[in-house]
Regions:
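Catalytic Tyr-X3-Lys loop
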Residues: 1-14, 33, 57
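Short-chain dehydrogenase/reductase
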Residues: 6, 10, 46-55, 93-95
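Amphipathic alpha-helical dimer-interface segment in Rossmann-like NAD(P)H-dependent oxidoreductases
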Residues: 8-26
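Structural signature of the Rossmann-like NAD(P)-dependent dehydrogenase/reductase core
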Residues: 9, 31-37, 74-77
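Short, well-ordered secondary-structure micro-motifs
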Residues: 17-18, 44-46, 88-89
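Catalytic loop of short-chain dehydrogenase/reductase
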Residues: 25, 31-56, 62, 66-69, ...
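C-terminal helical subdomain
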Residues: 70-128
Length: 128
């Protein structure tokens, strides 16, 4: 069970990044995005396996950013701190997927003079 969770939350991302970066390096451009969770930066009781994978994913993204940013490959890690869904307007209990997608696109289009490698997204009512 533990190995399967690590494979899903971390190792699969490594394999995808490995293959995608080969192609992007040939083109000398591209973006690779990883979706994390609040467990990427803090552990919770009864979620150690999930945290292991998400911490690993964040470390992978950070390492790849340092390795590939100078080669014009933009690496992004997105911490989604909350449930994703479409709540009625104004309730802010879940993170609407449309603004998430907009944030990913804006990240992809960042000016090269001001690239970031990580963004946290949460609702305005989420405690952190």
């Amino acid at each position: 069970k533990t190995q399967g969770a690590i494979n899903v939350t971390c190792f699969g991302a490594f394999l995808v990044a490995q293959e995608a970066s080969k192609r992007m390096l040939k083109r000398k451009s591209g973006s690779i995005f990883f979706t994390g969770a609040s467990a990427s930066v803090k552990g919770f009781a009864n979620s150690s396996v999930f945290a292991m994978g998400k911490f690993g994913l964040r470390g992978l993204a950070q390492s790849l950013a340092r390795e590939l940013h100078p080669q014009n490959i933009h690496i992004g890690h997105f911490i989604i701190d909350g449930a994703i869904g479409r709540e009625p307007f104004g309730t802010y209990e879940t993170i609407n997927p449309d603004p998430i997608a907009k944030t990913y696109l804006e990240f992809h289009n960042q000016d090269k003079s001001a690239w970031s490698w990580e963004i946290e997204l949460r609702t305005s009512v989420e405690k952190f």
